[in-house]
Curated annotation (Swiss-Prot):
Gene symbol of the encoding locus: rpoA
The keyword Transferase is assigned to this record: yes
Protein name per the record: DNA-directed RNA polymerase subunit alpha
GO molecular function: DNA binding; DNA-directed RNA polymerase activity; protein dimerization activity
Keyword Electron transport: no
Domain comment, as recorded: The N-terminal domain is essential for RNAP assembly and basal transcription, whereas the C-terminal domain is involved in interaction with transcriptional regulators and with upstream promoter elements.
GO biological process: one example: DNA-templated transcription
HAMAP family given in the database record: RNApol_bact_RpoA
Region (Alpha N-terminal domain (alpha-NTD)): 1-234
Organism: Roseobacter denitrificans (strain ATCC 33942 / OCh 114) (Erythrobacter sp. (strain OCh 114))
Protein purpose: DNA-dependent RNA polymerase catalyzes the transcription of DNA into RNA using the four ribonucleoside triphosphates as substrates.
EC annotation from Swiss-Prot or TrEMBL: 2.7.7.6
One Pfam family per UniProt: RNA_pol_A_CTD
UniProt superkingdom: Bacteria
Amino acid sequence: MIHKNWAELIKPQQLDVKPGNDPARQATVTAEPLERGFGLTMGNALRRVLMSSLQGAAITSVQIDNVLHEFSSVAGVREDVTDIILNLKGVSIRMEVEGPKRLSISAKGPGVVTAGDISESAGIEILNRDHVICHLDDGADVYMELTVNQGKGYVSAEKNKPEDAPIGLIPIDAIYSPVKKVSYDVQPTREGQVLDYDKLTMKVETDGSLTPDDAVAFAARILQDQLGIFVNFEEPESASRADEDDGLEFNPLLLKKVDDLELSVRSANCLKNDNIVYIGDLIQKTEAEMLRTPNFGRKSLNEIKEVLSGMGLHLGMDVEDWPPDNIEDLAKKFEDSF
């Protein structure tokens, strides 16, 4: 069928991940080659999912001794409660247990209270332990209880407030996303002798709770899962499906020689120079591999794709146990059926 071209579109042949200055948090991810226009499509989709849909952990509420609401101040603490809340939002957390969980901070002045002063709990790790929460003057004594939970995206303080919240519990806006920054760039790239492909480069920075390349992988998996509902047909039969009538483990058409396809002289010579003898050899090549063949261009590629399509085949197919040991004998056996 003419519409069944998804397997013939060129796919990225390599994913290059270059760590940044902080490998646990920064990386540049490059994918190429992509069909023209796919760089922008994929880059934009991945960026949106990275920023909005990955699971992370955040502080969702705080309760400070002798404080009734967020517009208060704490004796001996330089920052007011509003500033303390803002600083708590900046605490990066890796959480490997089901939430919500309660943590606490107990400190006396003089000194600086940092994220490293948050109490430890199994399955919860504070990543930016030097992050400043507040400054205490001499004689100051502060105790606060924190609620930590998992989620995705942004959740307002109003939604984080429990119905049975005790007096003094202050809900906090939660920014769960472990991804802090994402930018992408699309540049033209060459594949063989063809120049009109895309190269997608993404710069990703996380809070350290997961690596940038894992973040991209999770985002891609989310997109894959969400798009599956739109596929309203079954996959075509594989070329390696057994043919019950002849006992072969593959389509006998794969035994036909490419010399019999009546290709143009240029295309035929390119296949010959690349030691492609049978259709079974040809269909296992990807578009990218074909375009790397010397003197093989887009015109030859389109010609071969059209011929294969007429046979119900396409480039990039997977054929198990190819080539068979007795391929020449099998080719002669089925020669009259082609």
